[in-house]
């Protein structure tokens, strides 16, 4: 509540100041011949016999109740007021307004002070210098002028020799780069790139990675027909197993073992396949009985022709 009351009192105090300014009698403005820079002076006609008190008013400058001066300017494009800042003296605020007006409107701007017409040389230097419309650095400009309203704003000159040196150096660098890109250099760089790519990506067959190649790697190898089909002849032949020693053999294939009886051969045990031996013709009335795993088989077995 106290803050709200203080705000209301401050608002009422501002309104009274505004009314007091509006109630001041009209002033007759005249240009004093001895005033520096054509500063406009105003004399207050308070009444007969009253001594004239001269006050200076600048364009775009307003005095704050606490004694400082605020500068602002209306933007010609957006028709809005642009805040330029608060200054200690009216001359500083007037200079800030003049800078902003000349930056927005050029030579046609209405300013508080009279400025000399810039020559062609100064205009040429101004193009290469920093942009003039820098309203946020007006304090630095005003401080360098020692608060003098008659001092003209001189922009820092641009050293064209430095610019030429920079441009010449940039062009020489471009020429060096162009010389490096000669046909020989391009050819050598192309060869190096191709060799690098060939080392990274090794050549592979056209059918690599196909499903057929993957499936064939897991399929068992086909058995040759020469080992499975017996030769035909009119005589009695003997089937010989080349991989079996004289005493017998034992294969790696885990198949069922059988007990064979008949034709005076007695009992023999074998493990694995018998090749092309035909038990029906080779063993008359043979009786085969499963008899567990493992066993031996003699090297020769007789086989009758078909």
Curated annotation (Swiss-Prot):
Region of interest (Disordered), ranges: 1-46
UniProt cross-references to Pfam families, sorted A to Z: AP2
Family according to the record: Belongs to the AP2/ERF transcription factor family. ERF subfamily.
Tissue: Cotyledons, leaf primordia and shoot apical meristems.
The species this protein was found in: Arabidopsis thaliana
Gene: ESR2
Role: Required for correct embryo patterning and cotyledon organogenesis. May positively regulate the gibberellin signaling pathway leading to germination, hypocotyl elongation, and leaf expansion. Involved in the cytokinin signaling pathway that promotes shoot regeneration, probably through transcriptional activation of target genes such as CUC1. Acts as a transcriptional activator. Binds to the GCC-box pathogenesis-related promoter element. May be involved in the regulation of gene expression by stress factors and by components of stress signal transduction pathways.
Compositional bias (Basic and acidic residues): 1-17
GO cellular component: nucleus
General remark: 'Dornroeschen' means 'Sleeping beauty' in German.
UniProt-listed InterPro entries: AP2/ERF_dom, AP2/ERF_dom_sf, DNA-bd_dom_sf
Superkingdom, taxonomy of origin: Eukaryota
Localization annotation: Nucleus
Gene3D superfamilies xref list: AP2/ERF domain
High-level lineage: Eukaryota, Viridiplantae, Streptophyta, Embryophyta, Tracheophyta
GO MF, one annotated term: DNA binding
Assembly, per entry: Interacts with class 3 HD-ZIP proteins such as ATHB-8, CNA, PHB, PHV, and REV.
GO biological process assignments: cotyledon development; cytokinin-activated signaling pathway; embryonic pattern specification; ethylene-activated signaling pathway; gibberellic acid mediated signaling pathway; regulation of cell cycle; regulation of DNA-templated transcription; response to auxin
DNA-binding region extent: 57-114
Alphabetic keyword roster: Activator, Cytokinin signaling pathway, DNA-binding, Ethylene signaling pathway, Gibberellin signaling pathway, Nucleus, Transcription, Transcription regulation
Name of the protein in its database record: Ethylene-responsive transcription factor ESR2
Primary localization class, coarse: nucleus
């Amino acid at each position: 509540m106290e803050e709200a009351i203080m705000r209301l009192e401050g608002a009422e105090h501002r309104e009274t100041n505004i009314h007091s300014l509006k109630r001041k009698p009209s002033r007759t403005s005249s240009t004093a011949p001895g005033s520096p820079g054509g500063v406009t002076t105003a004399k207050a006609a308070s009444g007969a016999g009253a001594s004239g008190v001269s006050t200076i008013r600048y364009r775009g400058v307003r005095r704050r109740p606490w004694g400082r001066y605020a500068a602002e300017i209306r933007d010609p494009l957006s028709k809005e007021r642009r805040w330029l800042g608060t200054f200690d003296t009216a001359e500083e605020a007037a200079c800030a307004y003049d800078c902003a007006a000349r930056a927005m409107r050029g030579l046609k701007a209405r300013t508080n002070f009279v400025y000399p017409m810039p020559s062609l040389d100064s205009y040429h230097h101004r193009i290469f210098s920093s942009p003039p419309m820098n309203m946020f650095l007006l304090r630095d400009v005003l401080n360098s002028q020692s608060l003098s309203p008659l001092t003209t704003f001189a922009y820092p000159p641009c050293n064209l020799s430095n610019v030429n040196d920079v441009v010449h150096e940039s062009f020489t660098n471009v020429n060096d780069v162009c010389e490096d890109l000669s046909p020989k250099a391009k050819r050598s760089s192309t060869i190096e790139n191709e060799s690098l790519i060939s080392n990274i990506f090794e050549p592979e067959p056209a059918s690599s990675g196909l499903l057929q190649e993957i499936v064939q790697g897991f399929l068992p190898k086909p058995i040759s027909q020469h080992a499975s089909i017996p030769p035909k002849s009119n005589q009695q032949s003997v089937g010989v197993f080349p991989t079996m020693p004289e005493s017998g053999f034992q294969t790696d294939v885990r198949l069922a073992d059988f007990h064979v009886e008949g034709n005076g051969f007695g009992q023999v045990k074998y493990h694995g396949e018998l090749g092309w031996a035909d038990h029906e013709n080779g063993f008359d009335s043979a009786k085969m009985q499963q008899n567990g795993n493992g066993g031996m088989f003699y090297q020769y077995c007789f086989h009758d022709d078909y």
